């Protein structure tokens, strides 16, 4: 085992199907007029992928283990709450967050016009820098067919 303290990197992925009648929360922002996402919490794929990447990088588990459906206190929880709790858990375990990069994958909502607001909302909730991008799958897969939304995130953590 290497005794040199190095940064650690984690990857997180989250996918949720669209669900009529639910508000749409993505990247800690509500998207009025958009169909929401199904899920135990608010279905915020960007926040969930970021949490998963951070938990993985710090060896604290994954999204399902920490905030899973067996945890009723997180039913309906916002992505911002999950990000803040993830940051708290990492800090308690001796980790500092370097940054998080998130890519939202899907046809809607269109992120471009609110990307900076989304980055700020996620960064404030996490207490660390978050960058955000978005892409489509050119009609391929569940996101291309408009069945849901996905996100992938990469996180860098260092020993505090």
Curated annotation (Swiss-Prot):
A divalent metal cation binds at residues 14, 16, 48. Belongs to the IspF family. GO terms for molecular function: 2-C-methyl-D-erythritol 2,4-cyclodiphosphate synthase activity; metal ion binding. Keywords: Isoprene biosynthesis, Lyase, Metal-binding. It catalyses: 4-CDP-2-C-methyl-D-erythritol 2-phosphate = 2-C-methyl-D-erythritol 2,4-cyclic diphosphate + CMP. It comes from the Bacteria. It comes from Frankia casuarinae (strain DSM 45818 / CECT 9043 / HFP020203 / CcI3). This is 2-C-methyl-D-erythritol 2,4-cyclodiphosphate synthase. The gene is ispF.
